């Protein structure tokens, strides 16, 4: 009988933020996101100049955990989630650890989208979901081998999940998704009337000294 194995696995981590640490007041967090967006004129200007629909603090604010204690609570929980994911991935960090590199807010209104991209200077990337209205878009992940499939036929409709070229993860508010930063991903257009609110972040490798 033939022996078939799945090789070079791509892992996707999903859990409730509260699995590591106390629950976060989601109403307070959502209000904080809107308050920050309203006051962040530099971020608003960046979004307008770069054609980003809605709002992101990615290019304007680097100290959210210092400004708002609720973000510090989120980071404490994320540290534990990332540590659990690193254990699953069996990384050898050579005495070092993964440290939060940056964290930012995303508010996507109806019709907003975030095109395909990756995070080349980080090890682990992820998103914590604050508001996911009914019908909003999923996170779309792409098989990292896609560029090498020049002559490969397409997969049959209904192919097994692990064989599909794209995977759509539909998290709920309060969920954390983690993946390795080289994995290309996007947020398709938000068809929901309400805003899709999330907090994204990167972790980098802090080598032992």
Predicted regions and their residues:
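A generic structural micro-feature
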Residues: 7, 95-97, 118-122, 191-195
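Solvent-exposed residues in well-ordered beta-strands and their adjoining turns
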Residues: 18, 108, 129-131, 202-206
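Hydrophobic beta-strand-centered segment that forms part of the acyl-chain substrate-binding groove
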Residues: 89-110
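Catalytic core of Fe(II)/2-oxoglutarate
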Residues: 158-209
